[in-house]
Curated annotation (Swiss-Prot):
The gene is ycgR. Monomer. Interacts with the flagellar basal bodies. Its main location: other. Acts as a flagellar brake, regulating swimming and swarming in a bis-(3'-5') cyclic diguanylic acid (c-di-GMP)-dependent manner. Binds 1 c-di-GMP dimer per subunit. Increasing levels of c-di-GMP lead to decreased motility. This is Flagellar brake protein YcgR. One of its GO terms (molecular function) is cyclic-di-GMP binding. GO terms for cellular component: bacterial-type flagellum basal body.
Length: 229
C-alpha cells in the first residue's frame, strides 16, 4: 500500500502496540527495535536504538535495510531509507525517511507443502550460537515465505527469536534459495523422532527467490495429486 494515511495508520498501530520490528540487511546484519515516534510532516520515522550495540553499527553500514513486523495475523514489511543514528543527551534513536510504501502479507491460511517422499530437501546454515558448526537440516515443509526444519536432538538447541543471516535451501535440483531466517517457533516432536521442529520465516528472499519458491510449491502440489490418482 502507498496511501499516506494507510501507511501512517499501520505504523501508529505498531507504535501503540510496541510491536517488535526486525531490521535486516542483505549482508546479514540484523537488529530488533520498535517504533518510537512518527513525524510524517517532516518525513521522519523514529525507531528506538541502543547506540552502543555492535549489531546496530553493522546494520548502519548497509545501504539496504528492510523492516518486518507483525500486527496480529498480518506481516508488515517496508524499506528503510537514509537510516542514521542520532543522539539527544543520553538517549539514542534511529531516524529514517518516512516509508512511502508498506507491504502487507496475511500470515494465516498460507498453504504449506511437504516434500515428496523421493526427495530430500535441506537447509544449510551455521549454528547461530556456534558459528564453526555447519548444519544441514532436513526441510519438513515450506510455504510462501516460511519453512519448517528438523533439528536433531544431538545438535545444540536453537531458540525462538534467533535470526540466522545466511541460509541455503535446496528444495530440488532446480530450486536453490538464498535467504535469512528468523525462528518463530520451536516444537519438540514425539520421542521416536529424536528432535524438534523449527518454524521459520524466510528473510530477504527477493523477487526471484519468491517466484522460484512458488513454482516449487505448485509443482509439488501437482505431483502429489498425480501420485494419489
Amino acid at each position: 500500500m502507498s496511501a499516506p494515511a494507510e501507511v501512517f495508520s499501520l505504523l501508529k498501530q505498531c507504535a501503540d502496540g510496541n510491536v517488535l520490528l526486525s531490521l535486516s540487511s542483505p549482508e546479514g546484519a540484523a537488529y530488533t527495535t520498535t517504533v518510537w515516534a512518527l513525524d510524517p510532516a517532516r518525513g521522519l520515522l523514529c525507531l528506538s536504538a541502543d547506540g552502543g550495540d555492535i549489531k546496530l553499527q553493522r546494520l548502519l553500514e548497509s545501504e539496504e535495510v528492510v523492516a518486518v513486523g507483525y500486527l496480529d495475523s498480518v506481516k508488515l514489511q517496508f524499506d528503510l531509507h537514509d537510516l542514521v543514528l542520532v543522539h539527544s543527551g543520553r538517549a539514542s534513536a534511529l531516524n529514517a525517511r518516512f516509508p512511502r510504501e508498506l507491504y502487507r502479507f496475511q500470515r494465516r491460511g498460507s498453504y504449506r507443502v511437504r516434500p515428496l517422499l523421493n526427495t530430500s530437501p535441506t537447509a544449510t546454515l551455521r549454528h547461530p550460537a556456534l558459528p564453526d558448526m555447519q548444519l544441514s537440516l532436513r526441510v519438513l515443509d515450506v510455504s510462501i515465505g516460511g519453512v519448517a526444519l528438523f533439528l536433531p536432538d544431538d545438535v545444540p538447541p536453537i531458540e525462538p527469536g534467533v535470526q540466522i543471516a545466511q541460509v541455503q535451501v535446496d528444495l530440488d535440483g532446480d530450486t536453490r534459495l538464498q535467504s535469512g531466517l528468523i525462528v518463530h517457533h520451536v516444537t519438540l516432536l514425539h520421542h521416536e523422532s529424536r528432535g524438534a521442529r523449527l518454524g521459520c520465516e524466510m528473510l530477504n528472499l527477493g523477487g526471484d527467490g519468491e517466484r522460484a519458491l512458488q513454482r516449487y510449491i505448485d509443482q509439488t502440489q501437482k505431483r502429489r495429486r498425480l501420485l494419489s490418482l
